[in-house]
Amino acid sequence: MDASPRSRLSRMVKWFWQRPQTGRSFALKSRDAASSSTKIDFAELAPGIDTFLGQAAYLQLGYFETLSQLITSTPELAQKESLSRAAGAAYIKHRDLVALIRERGDEPTALMLPFREQLDAFRTATHGRRTEETMLTVHITAGMLDDFYLALAHSYGDTGRRVARILQADDDRDAIVTILTAKIEADQEWRSLLGLWGRRLVGDTLLVARAALRSGH
């Protein structure tokens, strides 16, 4: 019987933290020097509701945009179809968060705009040179930040509960795990490359979470 998406993801995470093998390797994008902080105290992060909603909505829009770009750059039809499902899921989450913001009497663009520059810079910095790197970027950053905002949602009463339901909807990213797992299992060089890239993404995602949430103070 095939491994579940969760077990495949666990294997990928394990690979990320194994020491890369020596030998020929691909070059990675350089990391901005501003990403050098090492530890984050999540207990200190408590943004206002407008900050929380604006960031959550804009993040989903960013996932949708990146996945849409991946559809264009991916040659295989089956992979395009899988990516289109993931893009559609991100769009639905964005749409539902925007609807919630409007129900509260606020203008979605006004809440999202303060975080556009910062979050766009994060997306640019974590956009890989290769399609597979960017697939991994979406899978790791979206997964971590969705979980992070889901945990924060419990601080915002009924509005937070509604946000939690939106974020808990199916993200349709299982196919990305399948694609990347096949690539890693078939090629030692890709295993090393994506392992390094994955570790970098974890650190950068924690940094953007801290910076974005503290901007609400």
Locate predicted features.
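Alpha-helical scaffold segments that form or flank carboxylate-/histidine-based iron centers
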Residues: G48-L53, L77-I92, T134, D158-A175, ...
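Acidic/His metal-coordination segments adjacent to aromatic residues that form catalytic metal sites
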Residues: W17, A34-G54, P114-V138
